[in-house]
């Protein structure tokens, strides 16, 4: 027994040693094989047996005298070559007849594709065809259906190839909205169709519809604070084309509607809706540009309309013209709305015109007599009243509300005429302008105003005589403050011409040091007052322009039709700014008063002016009049 145990231990020991040597040699061969692979590449790896197969072969050689031949079958997938046994190791169907059904079901299958990702079939988005189109009872072909399908496909292609390189709400969005607003304003002023003006400004209605879509999205974001889309999708342009197609289709014979019956005798050269739209756009461009080929394009368009109409109505005469509605407005044949608007304007002019004002003035005057002496003696009263009538007519022609304008004129605290005195105090008076004092709180001691006697919305609307008298007052006030060793800054704030408020020039005394720093303060304030993208220059340097235009720099470089702000650092010029957004600019001189508050270290309550003129005597009048008396140029008029 002991000998048998010893023999078993010896054999076991030898077997373990043999196993360790085999494992060592295997690791050694594996190390060299990795070295060869890294040196020579891995292109021949599939030709060598794997490490698992080599280990299995060594075990069979140790425990079996007869070597086991392993035949490698060609398998397309390396993954299954290393994970699954070869076909020779599997039991045949003869040995196990129960697997016949299983093996028969696996015939013809490619196991190399098992476990791979399922490829999704591409989706044809153009297969989402629109609903069935119904046309008139006289239609006996499918030309309209194929036409609409072609139009929709072409429309999608145009929208996809539109090349939109911006996003809704980006830095250029404000500029695009201003361009869109100018299109509507121009169409209203010139009484032209919006589409015609848009085609002239944008070049195509597609770009115009993109701008409309962006405007709707911005308004939706303001209301809901949600982003629906980043870029225009072309929905409005698609709807426009569909509406135009429907309008032209409905303008036919008005028969009952049923489904289209296919007709093999359709002419493939028949123009489509998109062809008509393209020809119409070319015709309109040629008309706007006065192209000499306009007549040929018109004939081509008319022929295309005839062909298209004949394709829709094959039973009718082929020479009949197609009745396609046009959006061009004919001024020789005005609409009912235009005639009503014109009649209202004429009634206003007849009611509130010069004859009405003249008759009203005569009725109030008990001393009236129809002779030249009376006209000479009362020429001043009649002329002042006629000026006011001219102002009202100008506002009527520009679309203003006459009732609102008359209310502003009747309640204006700065107008000075023979009938009413201004509520503001009058320090010095000339023929066309006067010096007054502002409401409380004032920006500085001896703060004063230069006001035209007539109701002017800005000083640019004043004539040359009025402007000369205003400049005379500016010179006198500058001399008065210079005698006090002070500088002066003049500014005019007229941001809203449509409100028709009486303008005035503010005169604020400052120290000489602050006067030298004032241009930097106002440059910074005007640069940040509006949005980054604006149509006009942020700052119009009239001080630099005075070197070329002299005292007329302000009147030549600014425009009276636009709301503006202007500050004078000298008598001849300073900085001008066109106010594009009245709400952002604010009311009651908010921007300039903020600048003066920062320069002069004023409290916050001074920024907003809350006072008003009462018509009572102001205690500041005597103090200012005593200072200004020696510099008053109107004394020469009295003498």
UniProtKB/Swiss-Prot annotation:
Q: Where is this region: Disordered?
A: 1-75, 86-105, 309-332
Keyword Kinase among record annotations: no
Subcellular location per the Swiss-Prot or TrEMBL entry: Nucleus
Any Pfam family matching the protein: CwfJ_C_2
| Record keywords | mRNA processing, mRNA splicing, Nucleus, Spliceosome
Q: What is its main location?
A: nucleus
Disulfide-bonded cysteines: none
The highest taxon in the source lineage is: Eukaryota
GO terms of biological process kind: mRNA cis splicing, via spliceosome; mRNA splicing, via spliceosome
Report biased composition (Basic and acidic residues) as residue ranges. 14-24, 44-75
In terms of InterPro entries, this protein maps to:
Cwf19-like, Cwf19-like_C_dom-1, Cwf19-like_C_dom-2, HIT-like_sf
GO cellular component entries: post-mRNA release spliceosomal complex; Prp19 complex; spliceosomal complex; U2-type spliceosomal complex
Keyword set includes Magnesium: no
Q: Where is the composition biased (Basic residues)?
A: 25-43
UniProt biased composition (Polar residues): 95-105, 312-324
Stated role: Involved in mRNA splicing where it associates with cdc5 and the other cwf proteins as part of the spliceosome. Involved in mRNA splicing.
Subunit composition and interactions: Belongs to the 40S cdc5-associated complex (or cwf complex), a spliceosome sub-complex reminiscent of a late-stage spliceosome composed of the U2, U5 and U6 snRNAs and at least brr2, cdc5, cwf2/prp3, cwf3/syf1, cwf4/syf3, cwf5/ecm2, spp42/cwf6, cwf7/spf27, cwf8, cwf9, cwf10, cwf11, cwf12, prp45/cwf13, cwf14, cwf15, cwf16, cwf17, cwf18, cwf19, cwf20, cwf21, cwf22, cwf23, cwf24, cwf25, cwf26, cyp7/cwf27, cwf28, cwf29/ist3, lea1, msl1, prp5/cwf1, prp10, prp12/sap130, prp17, prp22, sap61, sap62, sap114, sap145, slu7, smb1, smd1, smd3, smf1, smg1 and syf2.
Indicate the family of this protein. Belongs to the CWF19 family.
Protein name in UniProt: Pre-mRNA-splicing factor cwf19
Annotated gene? cwf19
């Amino acid at each position: 027994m002991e000998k048998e145990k010893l023999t078993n231990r010896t054999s076991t020991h030898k077997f373990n040693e043999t196993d360790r040597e085999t494992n060592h040699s295997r690791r050694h061969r594996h190390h060299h094989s990795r070295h060869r692979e890294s040196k020579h590449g891995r292109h021949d790896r599939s030709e060598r047996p794997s490490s698992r197969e080599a280990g299995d072969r060594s075990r069979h050689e140790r425990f079996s005298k007869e070597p086991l031949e392993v035949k490698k079958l060609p398998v397309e997938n390396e993954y299954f070559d290393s994970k699954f046994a070869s076909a020779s190791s599997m039991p045949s169907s003869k040995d196990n007849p129960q697997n016949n059904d299983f093996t028969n079901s696996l015939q013809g299958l490619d196991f190399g594709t098992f476990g791979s990702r399922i490829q999704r079939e591409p989706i044809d988005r153009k297969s989402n065809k629109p609903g069935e189109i119904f046309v008139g009872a006289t239609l006996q072909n499918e030309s309209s259906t194929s036409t609409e399908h072609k139009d929709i496909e072409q429309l999608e292609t145009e929208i996809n190839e539109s090349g939109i390189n911006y996003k809704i709400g980006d830095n250029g969005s404000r500029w695009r909205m201003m361009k869109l607003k100018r299109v509507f304003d121009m169409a209203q002023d010139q009484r032209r169709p919006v589409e015609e003006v848009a085609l002239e400004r944008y070049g195509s209605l597609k770009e115009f519809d993109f701008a409309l879509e962006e405007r709707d999205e911005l308004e939706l974001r303001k209301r809901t604070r949600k982003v629906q889309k980043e870029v225009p999708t072309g929905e409005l342009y698609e709807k426009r084309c569909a509406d135009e197609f429907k309008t032209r289709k409905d303008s036919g014979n008005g028969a009952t509607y049923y489904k289209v019956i296919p007709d093999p005798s359709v002419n493939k050269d028949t123009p489509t809706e998109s062809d008509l739209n393209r020809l119409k756009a070319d015709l309109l461009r040629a008309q706007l540009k006065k192209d000499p080929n306009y007549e040929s394009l018109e004939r081509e368009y008319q022929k295309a309309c005839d062909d298209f109409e004949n394709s829709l109505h094959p039973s009718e005469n082929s020479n009949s013209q197609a009745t396609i509605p046009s959006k061009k407005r004919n001024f020789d044949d005005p609409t009912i709305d235009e005639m009503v608007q014109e009649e209202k304007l004429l009634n206003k002019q007849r009611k509130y015109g010069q004859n009405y004002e003249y008759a009203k003035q005569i009725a109030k005057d008990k001393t009236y007599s129809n002779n030249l002496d009376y006209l000479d003696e009362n020429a001043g009263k009649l002329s002042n009243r006629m000026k006011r009538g001219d102002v009202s007519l100008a506002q009527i022609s520009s679309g203003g509300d006459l009732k609102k304008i008359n209310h502003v004129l009747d309640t204006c605290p700065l107008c000075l005429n023979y009938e009413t005195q201004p509520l503001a105090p009058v320090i010095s008076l000339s023929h066309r302008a006067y010096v007054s004092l502002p409401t409380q709180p004032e920006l500085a001691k001896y703060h004063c105003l230069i006001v035209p006697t007539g109701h002017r919305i800005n000083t640019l609307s004043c004539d040359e005589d009025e402007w000369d008298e205003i400049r005379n007052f500016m010179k006198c006030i500058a001399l008065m403050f210079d005698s006090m060793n002070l500088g002066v800054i003049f500014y005019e704030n007229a941001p809203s011409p449509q409100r028709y408020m009486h303008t005035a020039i503010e005169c604020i005394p400052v120290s000489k040091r602050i006067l030298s720093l004032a241009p930097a303060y106002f440059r910074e304030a005007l640069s940040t007052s509006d949005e980054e993208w604006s149509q006009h220059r942020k700052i119009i340097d009239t001080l630099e322009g005075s070197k070329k235009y002299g005292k007329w720099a302000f009147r030549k470089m600014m425009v009276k039709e636009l709301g503006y702000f202007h500050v004078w650092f000298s008598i001849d010029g300073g900085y001008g700014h066109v106010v594009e957004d009245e709400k952002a600019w604010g009311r009651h001189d908010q921007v300039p008063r903020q600048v003066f508050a920062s320069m002069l270290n004023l409290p916050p309550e001074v920024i907003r002016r809350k006072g008003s003129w009462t018509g009572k005597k102001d205690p500041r009048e005597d103090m200012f009049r005593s200072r200004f008396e020696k510099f008053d140029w109107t004394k020469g008029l009295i003498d």
